[in-house]
Every structure is written in structure tokens, then in C-alpha cells.
Design a protein with these regions (language model features):
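C-terminal alpha-helical interaction appendages
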Residues: 1-68
Length: 68
């Protein structure tokens, strides 16, 4: 998953406004950071997406993106 695909998946799953809020504000305990901070720290977009889906109860959206 590329960074651009991460953000496309966020918007497709949560919508533009809520998706941006989740990425910047929702603390993902398993990563010890928000999604934005985890990505900036070098965590793979795929791992961040998996944790975001789990934290928000949207495991059904886990595979909305393509696999490399």
C-alpha cells in the first residue's frame, strides 16, 4: 500500500471530513501514535491502515485497497 492509497482508502471508508479527523486526531494505541504521526515515523501505510480499521471497528474495510 502506498501513502496515496492509504489516503484514498481513508476517504472511501470514512468520508473526507471524518477520515481527516481520524488520521490526525485518533490515537492508535497499538502504534503509540496517530495515523499521521505513525506514517511520518516510517510505519508502513498498510500497518497503519490495519490498525485504523481495527480501532474504528471497520475490519470489513481492511482490504479495500489493492495489494502490491
Amino acid at each position: 500500500m502506498k501513502h496515496s492509497e492509504f489516503y484514498e482508502a481513508v476517504e472511501a471508508t470514512f468520508g473526507s471530513a471524518l477520515g481527516r479527523s481520524y488520521v490526525s486526531d485518533l490515537y492508535l494505541a497499538s502504534l503509540g501514535a496517530t495515523a499521521r504521526d505513525a506514517l511520518s515515523a516510517g510505519v508502513s501505510p498498510d500497518e497503519v491502515w490495519a490498525q485504523l480499521c481495527e480501532e474504528t471497528g471497520r475490519e470489513d474495510a481492511r482490504w479495500i485497497h489493492r495489494l502490491d
